[in-house]
């Protein structure tokens, strides 16, 4: 019997664990497994990296007495990771040839990027023994979508046709702008039975080009919109915000009711100065009622000192009225956040929020860029450690369980 690659992937969804088994090898044969893709939208990658960027990883294995290598049971003894880790080849993918892309500002021309195509090869002494291809997906095949265009925000709704009204989640990504990262997170959440609305609050055509004086009323309008959908349970709406999207979400929670629960990933407890390109805008990030929200200006000297001393700001400049927040609140933050001090911010939010249910998931090695399970994270490529990827799985699984428990099973108000 020749070498054969067995792909064991029941759901084929990007955040699900799978196994790859190699059969028909010689007893105790050393092999190299190579995983490749040039059809891959990676939420953790820079915005200008195209989906046809070439990614590759490899690992060395020794077959057992039956001539079998199983990624969930066999330890890698070399390559891009070592030890037993069934998703190690996926997590350790590296961008070998980066292809840059132009920004797409027109929502109707923005692709879903919901399919990822992989190629896997098995070699012994550099001789090819077997190869195969397979796909994984950001959303299930039965999830539909459509676009929304409003005066100052745009969105993409993901939903499964159903006779029952379902809970919904509003999804906001960070300072990169646009909707690409938000939509792929929204797709992942829709697989759990939620209607999801990914929002672009700046950076697309016919809306603000910079993260500067964005109206809080955008989220009020989005909430009212999703509450009126025939297939949505209007009393069970959650919100997910990451980075500046978490700041935007928390500010919304301080001034509006109607959100059943929230997950804030790498949050801030205060409003920071807006951005004009890569420079400070000299204005607030957000407005309310046509007026700028009080904000903390960016000061390079203070930033450097705080980074070196590992301290956070001790003033109250721009701190939100967190005491007004009452919905169940899950915070995900890092003690090594390289962008801002989400750890101290989370502690302050936990102390002040009046939520009847609240929790923090802390990461110690994974920093600010923390999205879904099993994605490679090029921001932390110098850290060759399993813990970064374990913390990504922990964070994402807690995100899913929080929304499921609060929106499907909780009867508290």
Regions found by a protein language model. Give the residues of each.
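N-terminal cap/lid segment of alpha/beta-hydrolase-fold proteins
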Residues: 3-13, 18-21, 26-29, 55, ...
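Short beta-strand element of the alpha/beta-hydrolase
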Residues: 165-174
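Hydrolase active-site cap/lid region
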Residues: 250-307
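Short amphipathic alpha-helix adjacent to the substrate-entry channel of hydrolases
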Residues: 180-199
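Alpha/beta-hydrolase active-site loop
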Residues: 209-230, 248-251, 397
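Alpha/beta-hydrolase fold nucleophile elbow
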Residues: 231-243
């Amino acid at each position: 019997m020749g070498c054969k690659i067995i792909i064991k992937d029941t759901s084929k969804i990007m955040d699900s664990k799978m196994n790859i088994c190699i059969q028909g090898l010689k007893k105790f044969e050393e092999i190299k497994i190579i995983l490749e893709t040039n059809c891959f939208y990676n939420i953790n990658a820079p915005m200008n990296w195209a989906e046809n960027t070439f990614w590759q990883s490899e690992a060395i294995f020794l077959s057992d007495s039956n001539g079998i290598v199983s990624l969930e049971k066999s330890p890698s003894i070399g390559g891009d990771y070592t030890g037993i880790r069934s998703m190690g080849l996926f997590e350790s993918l590296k961008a070998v040839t980066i292809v840059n892309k132009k920004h797409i500002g027109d929502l109707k021309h923005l692709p879903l990027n919901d399919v990822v195509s992989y190629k896997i090869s098995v070699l012994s002494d550099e001789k090819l023994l077997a190869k195969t291809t397979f796909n994984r997906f950001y959303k299930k095949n039965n999830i539909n979508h459509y676009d929304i265009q409003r005066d100052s925000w745009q969105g993409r709704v993901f939903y499964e046709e159903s006779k029952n009204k379902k809970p919904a989640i509003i999804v906001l990504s960070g300072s990169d702008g646009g909707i690409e990262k938000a939509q792929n997170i929204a797709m992942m959440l829709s697989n759990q039975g939620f209607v999801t609305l990914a929002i672009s609050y700046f950076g697309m055509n016919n809306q603000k080009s910079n993260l500067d004086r964005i109206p809080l009323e955008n989220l009020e309008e989005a909430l009212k919109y999703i509450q009126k959908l025939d297939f949505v349970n209007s009393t069970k709406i959650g919100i997910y915000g990451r980075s500046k999207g978490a700041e935007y979400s928390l500010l919304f929670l301080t001034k509006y009711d109607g959100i059943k629960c929230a997950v804030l990933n790498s949050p801030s407890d205060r409003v920071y100065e807006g951005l004009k390109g890569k420079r400070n805008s000299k204005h607030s990030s957000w407005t309310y009622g046509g007026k700028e929200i009080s904000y903390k200006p960016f000061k390079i000297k203070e930033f450097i000192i705080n980074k070196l001393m590992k301290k956070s700001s001790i003033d109250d400049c721009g701190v939100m009225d967190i005491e007004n927040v009452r919905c169940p609140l899950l915070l995900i933050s890092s003690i090594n956040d390289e962008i801002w001090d989400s750890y101290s911010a989370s502690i302050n939010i936990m102390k002040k929020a009046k939520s009847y249910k609240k929790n923090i998931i802390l990461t110690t090695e994974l920093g600010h860029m923390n999205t879904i399970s099993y994605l490679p994270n090029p921001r932390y490529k110098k850290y060759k450690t399993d813990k970064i990827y374990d913390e990504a799985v922990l964070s994402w699984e807690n995100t899913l369980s929080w929304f499921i428990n609060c929106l499907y099973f909780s009867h508290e108000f």
